[in-house]
């Protein structure tokens, strides 16, 4: 690899070391100059603001207006181009933003049991989507709202100086780079191993004016931004319209409830993510297999099976095992299974925390025959509820200073993340010959009882998804 690549890898390792030393509720990672305004950009902003006319605004088209479907292949091609154009500093910025997203995601996920109670089905959360949604709102925020959002995103500020401020455009561009780095790796022979699509829906009351620079800025995060207007006075009807619109445009399973909204709400800011991972060398078993939800209850579920040399570690002290299944050279699926089903909550607390990636250093290669459920999961959550449950400042209360988003009075009804997550077999290229299956050194790993999973990309140090599967056939 070229020296620049070695320098990038070394610097990322340094950033990881700094991250490991972080303590307390806030995460302080150096160097922050990668994501804050520098003196030059601050001077340019000051000059621009001095004689700047009012930002142009527009009223979004009605939600019933005809809209072209999202072309996911074109979206993936755009992400690949983004990744191809990244220089060393861009990759460092992506790695830093990836780690910041991890820390926020762990904290949010860590409070999920208090919000959802015991999860009897399956649930999935995206740290990068959480971070991207809050960074998008930061783009439209001013004054105290911006201060609080910046603190939640993990970037400290000492004063009101511009050079202490988070640069939302840099952060959103870095988030798109994080997505691009994941997708670009699996594009050999025009066959995508991984698919990751993000769509932002900005749903407003019919009279609300959006500022064009805000909507244009969101395109740095994802090219697909859908501003639409609708009546919120009948919340059930509004939620149904949003769901119908998003399913028509994307074809994904979505969920919009507007349970936290009121009839005078004027904004629902929703982020939709679709992930599809193909498990190289795995095949779908001919018959469904038993999955034990608990000691006395089982369900029949479609199962995937494959064999290869995978990284593996069994923790005898805390009674869980980890298997790392590669998607690409640097992206992988982490499967975490308690040795005893009753220990799922304990293992979740041990592994899904800020220093949890340290145990990845203990993994070693093993020849493994792996059997696991085929996963098709949908999860939706309102960030207002999650942040409140995580005891973070109530930054997403109904009335915020979002004057960079709109000059009109805004009452936030919902800040939704909706995840559509799929794992499927990719039988084009077997990982290793199945003739080895009966050899004594082959380790049998069967996920037929509750387990945890994560999708991790080393190239951006980003955990794209964290999930818990207590029953593959139902969502929490």
UniProtKB/Swiss-Prot annotation:
Q: A Gene Ontology CC term for this entry?
A: extracellular space
From the record, give the cysteines joined by S-S bonds.
Answer: 42-162
- Could you tell me the superkingdom of the organism this chain comes from? Eukaryota
SMART domains, per database record: SERPIN
Q: Which residues form the signal peptide?
A: 1-24
Locations listed in the record: Secreted
Major localization class: secreted
Q: Which GO terms describe its biological process?
A: positive regulation of epithelial to mesenchymal transition; regulation of apoptotic process; regulation of systemic arterial blood pressure by renin-angiotensin; response to angiotensin; vasoconstriction
What Pfam families does its record include? Serpin (PF00079)
Q: Write the record's keywords in alphabetical order, separated by commas.
A: Disulfide bond, Glycoprotein, Secreted, Signal, Vasoactive, Vasoconstrictor
A single GO molecular-function term is: serine-type endopeptidase inhibitor activity
The reply on keyword Disulfide bond is yes
Listed SUPFAM superfamilies:
Serpins (SSF56574)
Q: Which residues are glycosylated?
A: 38, 161, 295, 319
Q: Which PANTHER family match?
A: ANGIOTENSINOGEN, SERINE PROTEASE INHIBITOR, SERPIN
Function in brief: Essential component of the renin-angiotensin system (RAS), a potent regulator of blood pressure, body fluid and electrolyte homeostasis.
Record protein name field:
Angiotensinogen
Q: Which organism is it from?
A: Gorilla gorilla gorilla (Western lowland gorilla)
Gene coding for it: AGT
């Amino acid at each position: 690899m070229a020296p620049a690549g070695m320098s990038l890898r070394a610097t990322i390792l340094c950033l990881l070391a700094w991250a490991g030393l972080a303590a307390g509720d806030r995460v302080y990672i150096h160097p922050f100059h990668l994501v804050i305004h520098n003196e030059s950009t601050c001077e340019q902003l000051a000059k621009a603001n001095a004689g700047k006319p009012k930002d142009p605004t527009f009223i979004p088209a009605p939600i019933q207006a005809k809209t072209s479907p999202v072309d996911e292949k074109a979206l993936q091609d755009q992400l690949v181009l983004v990744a191809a154009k990244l220089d060393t500093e861009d990759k460092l910025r992506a790695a830093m933003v990836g780690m910041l997203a991890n820390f926020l995601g762990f904290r949010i996920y860590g409070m999920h049991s208090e919000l959802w109670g015991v999860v009897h089905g399956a649930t999935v959360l995206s740290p990068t989507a959480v971070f991207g949604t809050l960074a998008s709102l930061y783009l439209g925020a001013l004054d105290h709202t911006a201060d609080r959002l910046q603190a939640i995103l993990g970037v400290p500020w000492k004063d009101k100086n511009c050079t202490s401020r988070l640069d939302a455009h840099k952060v959103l561009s870095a988030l798109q780079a994080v997505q691009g780095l994941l997708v670009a790796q699996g594009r050999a022979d025009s066959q995508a191993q991984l698919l990751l699509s993000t769509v932002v829906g900005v749903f407003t009351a019919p009279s609300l004016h959006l500022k064009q620079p805000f909507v244009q800025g969101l395109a740095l995060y994802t090219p697909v931004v859908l501003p639409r207007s609708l009546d919120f006075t009948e919340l059930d009807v509004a939620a149904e319209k949003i769901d119908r619109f998003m399913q028509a445009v994307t074809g994904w399973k979505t969920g919009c409830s507007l349970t936290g909204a009121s009839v005078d709400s004027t904004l629902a800011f929703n982020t939709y993510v679709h992930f599809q991972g193909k498990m190289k060398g795995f095949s779908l078993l001919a018959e469904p297999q038993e999955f034990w939800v608990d000691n006395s209850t089982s369900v029949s579920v479609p199962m995937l099976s494959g064999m290869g040399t995978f990284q593996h570690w069994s923790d005898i002290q805390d009674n869980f095992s980890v298997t790392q299944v590669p998607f690409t050279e640097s992206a992988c699926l982490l499967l975490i299974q308690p040795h005893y089903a009753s220990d799922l909550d304990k293992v979740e607390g041990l592994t899904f925390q800020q220093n949890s990636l340290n145990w990845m250093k203990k993994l070693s290669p093993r020849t493994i025959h792996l059997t696991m459920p085929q996963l098709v999961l949908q999860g939706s959550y309102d960030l207002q509820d999650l942040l409140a449950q995580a005891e973070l400042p109530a930054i997403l209360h109904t009335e915020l200073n979002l004057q960079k988003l709109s000059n009109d009075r805004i009452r936030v009804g919902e800040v939704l993340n909706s995840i559509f997550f799929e794992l499927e077999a990719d039988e084009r290229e077997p990982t290793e010959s199945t003739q080895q299956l009966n050899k004594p050194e082959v380790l049998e790993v069967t996920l037929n009882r509750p387990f945890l999973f994560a999708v991790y990309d080393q190239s951006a140090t980003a955990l794209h998804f964290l999930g818990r599967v207590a029953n593959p056939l139902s969502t929490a």
